[in-house]
Amino acid sequence: ATEDGKIYNSDNEEPTVLRSTAYISAQKDPDKLVGFTRQNDVLLAFGEWTTEQFYDAAVASPASFMGRLDQGTLQVGCAAPDSIVHQEKNVFWVGSSKTGGFTVQMLDGVSNVQRVSTDSIDKVLNAEKTSITSANAYPLRVAGHFYYVLTLSASNRTFVYDIDEDRWTEWQSGSSGRFKYVSSDEHDDGAIVLHESDGTICTFDITVYQDNGSPIYCILQTAPIDRDTQHNKTCKRFELYGDEQTSSATVDIQYSDDNYKTFSTARTVDMQYRSWLTGLGKYRRRAWKCTHTANTPLRLEGFEEEFQEGAH
């Protein structure tokens, strides 16, 4: 394919035979061709702000065998060619349109296109500005869940969409920065990923809770909580609850009373037993932060806080 929209094809059953006349043009809008992929029985041609669809029209050689599916043109294009991911029945990509801004789009079938990014994700995407063109994505299927793994170069962050849960999370290698694996494949019925610089190939093992021997930082952080009043609150007890583990599975608990500027010294609870913290001081608005780095499973349901409201 060429940037001006020409999509060439080889002769039928002759992949090495290319003819200068065997092409069809993506020309519904005057945007540049960015990339393409296959979805069901159509070819998706992504422009800067539109996406056209082509099908096998059985046109005889030397012309292109393809025909345009006119009613299938989507009014959203692609901002980053390496963000295009085909997963079974869906296609994901970082979209752009004439109205401006970047979003993550999902195409189900050939006509049901929808935005799956949240306002928070869109804010980070738009902060990339022209660097959005270098965004990279790949698919993962682990433990029955499909993930769209999207890395942004300018912000040095990786965001992951779980299609089954309709939920976004952020992945890192170590305690900060992006997830440093750039592509995925399948091997022995499991997912494998390739490291961006040293060529290490790792497998996803749902019984191992480390990143190639290093801790995985699982961090849960709440928004500031005021209990619907600006009165002082005395926190008497804080308890996490979730799955009870068969071995020690510690979680560090911290809190911030100044909008994340500073956090308290970490104190530890163990999910092997029912345990809680006491003597947690006073606050008007408090954000909680829970950090798990042990090589153990963790599944939390929530937390319980016992507090006493003051008069002022």
Regions found by a protein language model. Give the residues of each.
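Beta-propeller and closely related beta-pinwheel folds
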Residues: 2-136
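Beta-sheet repeat architectures centered on beta-propellers
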Residues: 73-91, 96-312
